[in-house]
Amino acid sequence: NEVKEEIEISNKIFLKELGEIPTLFAFPYGETTTEIIELIKEYKFKVAFGQHSGIINETSNMYYLPRFSLNEKYGELDRVKFATSAQGLGVYDFIPANPTIDQNPPFIGFSLLDNKKVQGLDCFIFDSKGQVKREIFKFNERVEIRLNRELSTGRSRMNCTVKDSTGVWRWFGHQFYL
């Protein structure tokens, strides 16, 4: 398949130019599928990065990690300070499992390691049309999110945050692709 060919060509170039094949992988524009993630594992990459913001922690998917962009659009000092002082939210059992969604709007759900964080949690979803209105349902450690409209074609991002009892911001980010 095309992705496999691209990886093999890239690996040959890395080997020729650098003398080794990197163990880190970054998905162009963060767009991937569960099938491509499995392919990345077969090629023995240790971790892979999407293109969504967030904080890495013990529950993070090691093959769809957030990466924090610093550039002219997203490089303000306050944003950098926030990102470097925040901690992961402890999300597990996230659905939809596939970053490339096949149901629109997607049913979004996840659980938190610490159910005390559920009550103050807020989530924001953005696509090319702007912020998507949503309803958030909270059940013990489980969070379910229902969108009031379909996501637009292309990349959409979700960020969930909560301030914990010590005043530290907890953050989880995810990118969807349609």
Named regions from a protein language model:
Residues 4, 30-31:
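Soluble non-cytosolic domains of exported or imported proteins
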